[in-house]
Swiss-Prot record:
Residues 1342-1352, 1401-1416 have a biased composition (Basic and acidic residues). It is a peripheral membrane protein. Residues 1374-1392, 1445-1460, 1765-1774 have a biased composition (Low complexity). Changing N1651S: In TSC2; greatly reduces the ability to enhance the RHEB GTPase activity. Phosphorylation at Ser-939 and Thr-1462 by PKB/AKT1 in response to insulin signaling and growth factor stimulation inhibits the ability of the TSC-TBC complex to suppress mTORC1 signaling: phosphorylation promotes dissociation of the TSC-TBC complex from lysosomal membranes, leading to activation of mTORC1 by RHEB. Phosphorylation at Ser-1387, Ser-1418 or Ser-1420 does not affect interaction with TSC1. Phosphorylation by AMPK activates it and leads to negative regulation of the mTORC1 complex. Catalytic component of the TSC-TBC complex, a multiprotein complex that acts as a negative regulator of the canonical mTORC1 complex, an evolutionarily conserved central nutrient sensor that stimulates anabolic reactions and macromolecule biosynthesis to promote cellular biomass generation and growth. Within the TSC-TBC complex, TSC2 acts as a GTPase-activating protein (GAP) for the small GTPase RHEB, a direct activator of the protein kinase activity of mTORC1. Changing T1462A: Inhibits insulin-stimulated phosphorylation and activation of RPS6KB1. It is linked to Tuberous sclerosis 2: An autosomal dominant multi-system disorder that affects especially the brain, kidneys, heart, and skin. It is characterized by hamartomas (benign overgrowths predominantly of a cell or tissue type that occurs normally in the organ) and hamartias (developmental abnormalities of tissue combination). Clinical manifestations include epilepsy, learning difficulties, behavioral problems, and skin lesions. Seizures can be intractable and premature death can occur from a variety of disease-associated causes. Lymphangioleiomyomatosis: Progressive and often fatal lung disease characterized by a diffuse proliferation of abnormal smooth muscle cells in the lungs. It affects almost exclusively young women and can occur as an isolated disorder or in association with tuberous sclerosis complex. It comes from Homo sapiens (Human). This is Tuberin. The gene is TSC2. Changing D647N: In TSC2; uncertain significance. Changing N1643K: In TSC2; Abolishes GAP activity.
Length: 1807
């Protein structure tokens, strides 16, 4: 065969020549001959012949070898050479020679191969038939050269196979095997017959050799056989065995697998699998581990390996048994390979495995587990358990199709080596079969517990078994509880207390607790025994325990906590189930355990946690009146146990309870205990817990626990049944609490307190408990009571001051004998508390409550009263406190001033006025002076001993002695300087905008300014009314509603009446006219009553207030006939009668404001009626027309002021002047007849007078008539001499009574007056008033005083004059001159007009109306009471702005008084015109008025009020026009406004099951006995039909029976309350929704709800727009009640709903009423927020505003009636500099004041 390379090169050369690219190839023959042919010469042959020596031959052979490799020999040269050297191959020849010849042959074959031809066979034969087996390598080299490394066997084919077999016997080397590989690959067909033998020999070589290289090459040969030939079947077993063994060589693993894979891919593949399986099963190979391992490997890899042969159809089922057989003899390697193989099978082809396969696999796993017991192979153990885990994962994924029972048996067999997760699965599987449907399930459970709980150490496994046990118990306990507890629980869990694993202990304990909770058999005690052992573990840490290990150690005690908490749950269940003894034992165990805590001083955090939760539960225990114990559910509703009581059972009560109701199931609702002798009540005495609580208070070191106990104790103490049914010592509790506050050790022992913890926090926690303990005062020792009050006093200096004040207020009610001793010091201590918003309401309500307990402060000295005022005054500051607090402060001041002892009051007036000035007035001022007054310190350091002199008094103003003058003027000055200068401060002030936001929650932005203004006015008016109140009560205790006695009615019947407006008071003077005597003489009194000053018109009767307290006392005796009753409904007390406009037609008041009686309202008088038509002229003069009647000389003075009315009845003691012209006109006969009649009447009159003067002033009577008169009868004093002595004695007796009450008969009191009061009015209340004004005429009109300089402070602005309507001519140009102000502190100045400009009131000229509202500056001054002269003040005083000035009002640009503003008295023309005009005006009515007998009221008024120079126009009294019905109505409406506040409170009764039903509550017609007792204490029962709605405030209740027959009302000095009681109102069938009741109850701001339902009453149950606050009264046992407040969310800032008071039945009505009244005051303030401009006023403020509006209207009327008067406009209420730039500075006013007035006033102008 030619060499391929030469062929290739030849082809390339030919291709190049063909394409013309290469040089033409020369003739090869010629080329060979010329270039490469080597000629074998004879010489060469000779050198090679035998003749030459061996060495020469060998040398030559070497040279020819070199040539033969490179050059071609000539033809037949090779044969020649071979012939020459052939002999050298003989065996006897030297080795070198043989090797040289073989090398020559190799060279010739390599170099001359193409030309050898048949010589190749020759050479092959030489090698094959070599005489010896030597020279193998060289011969092999020649063979490799001949066959081109086995590829070409030309001429060698026939003998090649024999040569190979021969050679394999003698020279089987790796070199030959490599040649053999090529022989098989390229010439396999020549080897077929001998291939089996070759394979056998190679296999043997593989087995026998140790050379990996030989084996690798042998594998290459075998691979070539398999791939290029056909492996004989008979060679297959050996072939497989060889590979199975060879595969164990690590380096040959890959080629072996490749060879096997090639084999398995042939037609022998299945046979090979079979052979390998046979090998695994053959017992002969059982010990041959490498062989079995290889077989397992090949089978596994071939059938389910990574490169499996899909051509093989063997299933795992067919080969796995062989695997199983291969494990017959334990061998680690084989087992390992089998595990790897089947793990690979399971992971890859788990879904294809059938049940049979899984069975075999489980058999294999089982045998593996058996082998693990004998084979100590960690690797095998690991991989086997991994296999089990793999199968387990398949089970979890539901992909295991074998027998789970079989598998879990295997797992259980090796459970000790299995991981926890596997055992958890095993236990879960086992638990599925533990149920009653399985035979022996309890035994199985017991076995499971024994195997995996008692014998197992791993916690997770044991916990899992406990879960199984718990589940089994949960499912089957209802029917098998007995067996399970007996056989399993007690036997398996009895050792739990000693168990080492705390987690297992904890869970086992929880299991026992859960089981015990529902266990009702005798086994319950067995379970509790185990739990008790768990609880007995010590909670003390070991001494060597470090801090960082505390948490870990605490965790080991969790089972104790579980046991205790479990007992709490058990107790909660056992309370309501039988037998009751179970609850008793649990309760005792709990208490005993907590006692251990304090006995051994457990301080670990877990111990504190146990105590915390135990107390948290135990302090929820409650008891009802039947002593049944109960616990609140999650909704807070307490359910009481029918089987457990809180005391040691008594047979009587026990039997009574047994028969009280039917048998109820344990889980049913609470009810009476079931009947029958088997039922036995359990005793759970609270005293056990109580003792532990005492230990806690004394020893507890954890603040959280102590705080919880203190926080829960107040509510527990409400249930007195708990305390009193077993021996609980409240004395010890009180001692423990007090020692906590007083002892220093409490804070030292506490730990766990928050940062910054102090004694204050301790007080905050303890004080509520002490407050709750007050209700036990009857069971406390007096010492303990005092100690408790002392602790509360100490708390006043801490943050808990508000709670302490509330507690002390309860003490005041419940423990008066204790508090009365501590109260003087306590009140002084209260002054040290800073005035803060949080303290305001508790403190003021405490003082308000205390004021109504006069027995507590009857021993108060001045210091205590001063302290009360010092406490209250700072809260009148409107810039710091809301409106409710300010109003409440004023209420407290008024109450305490009235209740203050009379001798002290005078000194407190400057004290209070100074406080009001500093807190109220300065709060509206921008000056720094505002903050310079500290109410508390100043109040106590400057106690009011006497009035101080503010300015030196001015001399020469009166005729009084110097000392008295000094006293009077200094009093006035001090009063003016300290308190009355309201105007002085306010005019300069600016309203702080913060006031509105502080007091008005919902103010509209547009009304903020108006609200500010109204709010400012409100606080100033509060101040005015306060000062007015003090002036009223400073020297007397008379009530605010006078009652005219029957004798007074007789004396004054038909008398003449005039009313003056003096400051902020209305002074009405009524004089007698003698109609009583006329009737005695047989004359008709109707003649006199038909005149112009008749009192028959209902519009002129003085009306009493609607709610007269005196009426409440005298109503039973008064049955007044009434006409048709009109229903009077009111939204809030008294507001229905508030006067908005004063010019309301009289017809609107006929229904409700007319006097009861037969009188009818006459038609309105015509405006221009003539005198003749009004008064019939008598044609004949008789006795009655001229004789002074017996009743003449009497006068009544009625003063109406904001805080009430005062009335005096006085007689004129002056005899009639002998120079009277009237006497001369009287016939002597008629005069004597009259005197005789007087003597006959004397005795009767004397008796009547004494009786009348002995009637108390507080009783009510028909109001006096108000006839008007403009003339003074000159004969009015004639009768005085006849009864002068009698009257003098009578009045003196009255005076002495007053003097004795005041206690100062010898001194002249000095009065400090409120705004708008003159000294003379105040003097009317003094002892000297009767002597000075009734019996004395020392001040006569003839005694002219010298004019003195007056300071002019008021200025007027002349406006366009109004032209008179009469005749159309302009009126005389008149102006008035401002004088000294009258009312120093009038905060709302109105225009005050002189009567001389008004002219005679009787003149009825038509006047025009001005459209703009006209106002004037109001100023004030003082009046000297002794001389009735108006003294100058000299203090800068300006009126408070009220509204913006009209822009059209001109002012004097020069700042001086404008011309025409005043007129000089020296101008005769003007003065003459005025006098002439006035005379002409008065002349028309004088003749008629003079005919009316009696003293003209002007005479009386002038004696009291006249001064030669009043000063300012505003100081002058203003006479109300008699003819104007609108002014009469205004006065009448003022009388309709009560002089004290009114409140209406709803009272509801909530019965059992009614807490959520409005209809049921409103349908109640009666309540419980305790409810009835409560109503009785609320007030006085009144019968509605006997009540006059205008006398008694009923809050809208009908008096005709529409709203029932009775109700309750209550009153004190300054307020009256009526109670709308739902159960006293009729329940009508037609009114199904109870609307008749709800129209009253739904409109009441505050409701007292007597909640007897046992459930919570929620706000909103009674639906109403105005139900702001509920006072909830919840009756408790032992005659106690819980009183709490509920309010709407928008009221939360005003009412403190956190306060709950425990009050006894005896004091409940008082406390509930007080809380309701305070809440109603707050509600009225809140209600006013909806309209910020309608600030809530008290009735006093309403009266004050009404009087001020009346003054303003009178001034406006004066301006209309006198067009020549320049109208005086007041400055605006807004900031003057900004809005009225033309207003002059104060400096101008000061200058004006220094100008003297050069005129003397004409007093007839205002009378």
């Amino acid at each position: 065969m030619a060499k391929p390379t030469s062929k290739d090169s030849g082809l390339k050369e030919k291709f190049k020549i063909l394409l013309g690219l290469g040089t033409p190839r020369p003739n090869p023959r010629s080329a060979e001959g010329k270039q490469t042919e080597f000629i074998i010469t004879a010489e060469i042959l000779r050198e090679l012949s035998m003749e030459c020596g061996l060495n020469n031959r060998i040398r030559m052979i070497g040279q020819i070898c070199e040539v033969a490799k490179t050059k071609k020999f000539e033809e037949h040269a090779v044969e020649a050479l071979w012939k020459a050297v052939a002999d050298l191959l003989q065996p006897e020849r030297p080795l070198e020679a043989r090797h040289a010849v073989l090398a020559l042959l190799k060279a010739i074959v390599q170099g001359q191969g193409e030309r050898l031809g048949v010589l190749r066979a020759l050479f092959f034969k030489v090698i094959k038939d070599y005489p010896s087996n030597e020279d193998l390598h060289e011969r092999l080299e020649v063979f490799k050269a001949l066959t081109d490394n086995g590829r070409h066997i030309t001429y060698l084919e026939e003998e090649l196979a024999d040569f190979v077999l021969q050679w394999m016997d003698v020279g089987l080397s790796s070199e030959f095997l490599l040649v053999l590989v090529n022989l098989v690959k390229f010439n396999s067909c020549y080897l077929d017959e001998y291939i089996a033998r070759m394979v056998q020999m190679i296999c043997l070589l593989c087995v026998r050799t140790a050379s990996s290289v030989d084996i690798e090459v042998s594998l290459q040969v075998l691979d070539a056989v398999v791939c290029y030939n056909c492996l004989p079947a008979e060679s297959l077993p050996l072939f497989i065995v060889t590979l199975c063994r060879t595969i164990n060589v690590k380096e040959l693993c890959e080629p072996c697998w490749k060879l096997m894979r090639n084999l398995l891919g042939t037609h022998l593949g299945h046979s090979a699998i079979y052979n390998m399986c046979h090998l695994m099963e053959d017992r002969a190979y059982m010990e041959d581990a490498p062989l079995l391992r290889g077989a397992v490997f090949f089978v596994g890899m071939a059938l389910w390996g990574a490169h499996r042969l899909y051509s093989l159809r063997n299933s795992p089922t067919s080969v796995l048994p062989s695997f199983y057989q291969a494990m017959a003899c334990p061998n680690e390697v084989v087992s390992y390979e089998i595990v790897l193989s089947i793990t690979r099978l399971i992971k890859k082809y788990r879904k294809e495995l059938q049940v049979v396969a899984w069975d075999i696999l489980l058999n294999i796993i089982e045998r593996l587990l058996q082998q693990l017991q004998t084979l100590d192979s960690p690797e095998l153990r690991t991989i086997v358990h991994d296999l089990l885990t793999t199968v387990e994962e398949l089970c979890d994924q539901n992909e295991f199709h074998g027998s789970q029972e079989r598998y879990f048996e295997l797992v259980e067999r090796c459970a000790d080596q299995r991981p926890e997760s596997s055992l958890l699965n095993l236990i879960s599987y086992r638990a599925q079969s533990i149920h009653p449907a399985k035979d022996g399930w309890i035994q199985n459970l017991q076995a499971l517990m024994e195997r995996f709980f008692r014998s197992e150490s791993r916690g997770a496994v044991r916990i899992k078994v406990l879960d199984v046990l718990s589940f089994v118990l949960l499912i089957n306990r209802q029917f098998y509880e007995e067996e399970l507890i007996n056989s399993v629980v007690i036997s398996q869990l009895s050792h739990i207390p000693e168990d080492k694993d705390h987690q297992v202990r904890k869970l086992a304990t929880q299991l026992l607790v859960d089981l015990a909770e529902g266990c009702h058999t005798h086994h319950f005690n067995s379970l509790l025994d185990i739990i008790e052992k768990v609880m007995a573990r010590s909670l003390s840490p070991p001494p060597e325990l470090e801090e960082r290990d505390v948490a870990a150690y605490s965790a080991s005690l969790e089972d104790v906590k579980t046991a205790v908490l479990g007992l709490l749950v058990i107790l909660q269940t056992k309370l309501y189930t039988l037998p009751a003894s179970h609850a008793t034992r649990v309760y005792e165990m709990l208490v005993s355990h907590i006692q251990l805590h304090y006995k051994h001083s457990y301080t670990l955090p877990i111990a504190s946690s146990i105590r915390l939760q135990a107390f948290d539960f135990l302090l929820l225990l409650r008891a009802d009146s039947l002593h049944r114990l109960g616990l609140p559910n999650k909704d807070g509703v307490v359910r009481f146990s029918p089987y457990c009581v809180c005391d040691y059972m008594e047979p009587e009560r026990g039997s009574e309870k047994k028969t009280s109701g039917p048998l109820s199931p344990p889980t049913g609702p609470p009810g009476p205990a079931p009947a029958g002798p088997a039922v036995r009540l359990g005793s759970v005495p609270y005293s056990l817990l109580f003792r532990v609580l005492l230990q806690c208070l004394k020893q507890e070191s954890d603040w959280k626990v102590l705080k919880l106990v203190l926080g829960r104790l107040p509510e527990s103490l409400r249930y007195k049944v708990l305390i009193f049914t077993s021996p609980c010592s409240v004395d010890q509790l009180c001692s423990a609490l007090c020692s906590m506050l007083s002892g220093p050790k409490t804070l030292e022992r506490l730990r766990g307190a928050p940062e910054g913890f102090s004694r204050t926090d301790l007080h905050l926690a303890v004080v509520p408990v002490l407050t709750a303990l007050i209700s036990y005062h009857n069971y406390l020792d007096k010492t303990k009571q005092r100690e408790m009050v002392y602790c509360l006093e100490q708390g006043l200096i801490h943050r808990c001051a508000s709670q302490c004040v509330v507690a002390l207020s309860i003490c005041s009610v419940e423990m008066p004998d204790i508090i009365i001793k501590a109260l003087p010091v306590l009140v002084v201590k209260l002054t040290h508390i800073s005035a803060t918003a949080s303290m305001a309401v508790p403190l003021l309500e405490f003082l308000s409550t205390l004021a109504r307990l006069p027995h507590l402060y009857r021993n108060f000295a001045a210091e205590q009263y001063a302290s009360v005022f010092a406490i209250s005054l700072p809260y009148t500051n409107p810039s710091k406190f809301n409106q409710y607090i300010v109003c409440l402060a004023h209420h407290v001041i008024a109450m305490w001033f009235i209740r203050c002892r009379l001798p002290f009051r005078k000194d407190f007036v400057p004290f209070i006025t100074k406080g009001l000035r500093s807190n109220v007035l300065l709060s509206f001022d921008d000056t720094p002076e505002k903050d310079s007054f500290r109410a508390r310190s100043t109040s106590l350091n400057e106690r009011p001993k006497s009035l101080r002199i503010a300015r030196p008094p001015k001399q020469g103003l009166n005729n009084s002695p110097p000392v008295k003058e000094f006293k009077e003027s200094s009093a006035a000055e001090a009063f003016r300087c300290r308190s009355i200068s309201v105007s002085e401060h306010v005019v300069r002030s600016r309203i702080q905008t913060s006031l509105t936001s502080a007091s008005l929650g919902s103010a509209d932005e547009n009304s903020v300014a108006q609200a500010d203004d109204s709010l400012k006015n409100l606080h100033l008016e509060l101040t005015e009314t306060c000062l007015d109140m003090m002036a009223r009560y400073v020297f007397s205790n008379f009530t605010a509603v006078p009652k005219r006695s029957p004798v007074g009615e007789f004396l004054l019947a038909g008398g003449r009446t005039k009313t003056w407006l003096v400051g902020n008071k209305l002074v009405t003077v009524t004089t007698s006219v003698g109609t009583g005597t006329r009737s005695l003489l047989g004359l008709d009194s109707g003649e006199l009553q038909s005149g112009p000053e008749s009192s028959s018109s209902p519009g002129v009767h003085v009306r009493q207030t609607k709610e007269a307290p005196a009426k409440l006392e005298s109503q039973a005796g008064q049955q007044v006939s009434r006409g048709a009753r009109d229903r009077v409904r009111s939204m809030s007390g008294g507001h229905g009668l508030r006067v908005g406009a004063l010019d309301v037609p009289a017809s609107q008041f006929l229904g409700s404001a007319t006097s009861p009686g037969p009188r009818t309202a006459p038609a309105a008088k015509p405006e221009k009626a003539s005198a003749g038509t009004r008064v019939p002229v008598q044609e004949k003069t008789n006795l009655a027309a001229y004789v002074p009647l017996l009743t003449q000389g009497w006068a009544e003075i009625l003063v109406r002021r904001p805080t009430g009315n005062t009335s005096w009845l006085m007689s004129l003691e002056n005899p009639l002047s002998p120079f009277s012209s009237d006497i001369n006109n009287m016939p002597l006969q008629e005069l004597s007849n009259a005197l005789m009649a007087a003597e006959r009447f004397k005795e009767h009159r004397d008796t009547a007078l004494y009786k009348s003067l002995s009637v108390p002033a507080a009783s009510t009577a028909k109001p006096p008539p108000l006839p008007r008169s403009n003339t003074v009868a000159s004969f009015s004093s004639l009768y005085q001499s006849s009864c002068q002595g009698q009257l003098h004695r009578s009045v003196s007796w009255a005076d002495s009574a007053v003097v004795m009450e005041e206690g100062s008969p010898g001194e002249v009191p000095v009065l400090v007056e409120p705004p708008g009061l003159e000294d003379v009015e105040a003097a009317l209340g003094m002892d000297r008033r009767t002597d000075a004004y009734s019996r004395s005429s020392s001040v006569s009109s003839q005694e002219e005083k010298s004019l003195h300089a007056e300071e002019l402070v008021g200025r007027g602005i002349p406006i366009e004059r109004v032209v008179s309507s009469e005749g159309g001519r302009p009126s005389v140009d008149l102006s008035f001159q401002p004088s000294q102000p009258l009312s120093k502190s009038s905060s709302s100045p109105e225009l005050q007009t002189l009567q001389d400009i008004l002219g005679d009131p009787g003149d009825k000229a038509d006047v025009g109306r001005l459209s703009p509202e006209v106002k004037a500056r109001s100023q004030s001054g003082t009046l000297d009471g002794e001389s009735a002269a108006w003294s100058a003040s000299g203090e800068d005083s300006r009126g408070q702005p009220e509204g913006p000035l009209p822009s059209s009002s001109p002012r004097s640009p020069s700042g001086l008084r404008p011309r025409g503003y005043t007129i000089s008295d020296s101008a005769p023309s003007r003065r003459g015109k005025r006098v002439e005009r006035d005379a002409l005006k008065s002349r028309a009515t004088a003749s008629n008025a003079e005919k009316v007998p009696g003293i003209n009221p002007s005479f009386v008024f002038l004696q009291l009020y006249h001064s030669p120079f009043f000063g300012d126009e505003s100081n002058k009294p203003i006479l109300l026009p008699n003819e104007s019905q609108s002014f009469e109505r205004s006065v009448q409406l003022l009388d309709q406004i009560p002089s004290y506040d009114t409140h209406k409170i709803a009272v509801l009764y909530v019965g059992e099951g009614q807490s959520n039903s409005e209809l049921a509550i409103l349908s109640n017609e009666h309540g419980s006995y305790r409810y009835t007792e409560f109503l009785t204490g609320l007030g006085r029962l009144i019968e509605l039909k006997d009540c006059q709605p205008d006398k008694v405030y009923l809050g809208g209740l009908d008096v005709c029976g529409e709203d029932g027959q009775f109700t309750y009302c209550w009153h004190d000095d300054i307020m009256q309350a009526v109670f709308h009681i739902a159960t006293l109102m009729p329940t009508k069938d037609v009114d199904k929704h109870r609307c008749d009741k709800k129209r009253h109850l739904g409109n009441d701001f505050v409701s007292i709800v007597y909640n007897d339902s046992g459930e919570d009453f929620k706000l909103g149950t009674i639906k109403g727009q105005f139900n702001f606050v509920h006072v909830i009264v919840t009756p408790l046992d032992y005659e106690c009640n819980l009183v709490s407040l509920q309010c709407r969310k928008d009221m939360e800032g005003l009412v403190d709903t956190s306060v709950a008071k425990i009050v006894s039945d005896r004091n409940l009505p008082f406390v509930a009423r007080q809380m309701a009244l305070h809440a109603n005051m707050a509600s009225q303030v809140h209600h006013s927020r909806s309209n910020p401009t309608d600030i809530y006023p008290s009735k006093w403020i309403a009266r004050l505003r009404h009087i001020k509006r009346l003054r303003q209207r009178i001034c406006e009327e004066a301006a209309y009636s006198n067009p020549s008067l320049p109208l005086v406009h007041p400055p605006s209420h807004s900031k003057a500099p900004a809005q009225t730039p033309a207003e002059p500075t104060p400096g101008y006013e000061v200058g004006q004041r220094k100008r003297l007035i050069s005129s003397v006033e004409d007093f007839t102008e205002f009378v």
